[in-house]
Amino acid sequence: MKASHAVWEHSGNAKAPHVQLRNGHCTDGFIDTLQYLSSTANLVFATEAMAVKLTAKLGGRQADWAFGSPMAGIPFATLVGVKMGIPRVGFTEKTGNNKDQICRFDMLPGTVFLDIEEMTTSGETPQRLINAIMKKNPGAESLPFIGALLIRCERRPSALLGKEIVPLVDLPELGVKYNEWGADCPLCAKGSRVITNAKKVWFDLLRTMQDPMHVISEAEYAESR
């Protein structure tokens, strides 16, 4: 993923900015799976590998729908669903509140669906997808597991309410640990500024690993903690 320019890690220099995650925590490292999956070769490779793992996990059972959450999860879930032979693919949409999701697809009672994410940090995003689908289709059935290209949390995070994540890349299992902090963030304490729109200024952010003084003109910053 580093070869795909998908990995940012804070240099340790307080003059360089760091990143705020969607859950509001600060972090000293982040992997933007968008950059990795934008390569069609990577997308095909990851799709095939994910389909193999999820098909094995299903154990002969068939899902009726594959769903992806906005935005990067949609093409990944769609291609994995096609590879698995799942008859229908869908997605949720964000509302005015950046965290809320809605589902516009109607499903018959008893319809089984599988959530496939490109990444999850805590399990909150896939749970919001599941909630949105079940609100629209209370008779549908969510499988007891989801797929994910990459996770930086445990495989049964509390936010996912008991469901298991089947990942391709499990950062904790690989020993890759990026710190997360709340109000006690040591980088904030040292004067490092917090970028809230990292994905929108990604390549500028990568430059700060070598040049901590690099100016990111379109960065949005959180208030100092």
Model-found features: residue ranges?
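Short hydrophobic segments within beta-strands
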Residues: 69, 116, 147-149
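Short glycine-rich phosphate-binding loop at a beta-alpha junction
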Residues: 60-70
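Residue-level preference for short coil/turn positions at secondary-structure junctions
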Residues: 62, 108-110, 181
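Short, glycine/charge-rich flexible loops or terminal/linker lids adjacent to PRPP-binding catalytic cores
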Residues: 71-117, 121-128
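Short, well-ordered alpha-helices that flank and scaffold nucleotide-derived cofactor binding pockets
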Residues: 52, 56, 82, 131, ...
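Conserved acidic residues
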Residues: 64, 111-113, 144
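PRPP-dependent phosphoribosyltransferase catalytic core
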Residues: 1-3, 130-225
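Active-site-facing substrate-recognition patch
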Residues: 1-59, 200-203, 207-225
